[in-house]
Amino acid sequence: MASGGSPVWALVALLSLLPLVARGERAVGAPEEVPVSNPGVQEAARFALEAYNRASNSMFCYKPVRVLKAETQVVSGMQYYLTVEIVNTRCEKKVGCGLKNMGSENCAVPSEAEQKQICEFVVWSRPWMQDTRLSSISCTPSSS
């Protein structure tokens, strides 16, 4: 017997989602905007910037200016989608780029405000496995 009914079931499944879309509701598991002050967001931003500093070719550390936007998505763990404004400092990487070192005068921000960048980070956290990963980085110079 031919299985010609499968396209019909796909259409029925798709049509069943229309009421959710029409009301503006999000599908279960879709990314959801959260306050930038959320502790999980702040921890993910800290992790992302430390990973960015390790990976960058700059001799100096970057530090966060502010988290501009944050979304979370429940996956196998929590995925954080972050838009963060960062700035280059005068703090040399050999001193360390941890937040405790960022307050010193050596980590002052150069007067050239062109050092700012807007970065999109995706951080995947699975706390029960003590596993946090930076899945994606994309930075562009800030226009402000």
UniProtKB/Swiss-Prot annotation:
Pfam families: Cystatin (PF00031)
Tissue note: Expressed by the venom gland.
Gene3D superfamilies: 3.10.450.10
Family annotation (PANTHER family): CYSTATIN-M (PTHR47033:SF1)
GO molecular function: cysteine-type endopeptidase inhibitor activity
Family annotation (InterPro entries): Cystatin_dom, Cystatin_sf
Matches recorded under SMART domains: CY
Cellular compartment(s): Secreted
UniProt keyword annotations, A-Z: Disulfide bond, Protease inhibitor, Secreted, Signal, Thiol protease inhibitor
SUPFAM superfamilies: Cystatin/monellin
Taxonomic placement: Eukaryota, Metazoa, Chordata, Craniata, Vertebrata
Keyword RNA-binding: no
Cystine connections: C91-C107, C119-C139
Motif extent (Secondary area of contact): 73-77
GO CC, one annotated term: extracellular exosome
This protein's record includes keyword Magnesium: no
Domain spans labelled Cystatin: 29-128
Function as written in the Swiss-Prot or TrEMBL entry: Inhibits various C1 cysteine proteases including cathepsin L, papain and cathepsin B. This protein has no toxic activity and its function in the venom is unknown. It may play a role as a housekeeping or regulatory protein.
The protein, known as: Cystatin-POGU1
Site, Reactive site: residue positions: G29
Coiled coil regions in record: none
Domain of life, source organism: Eukaryota
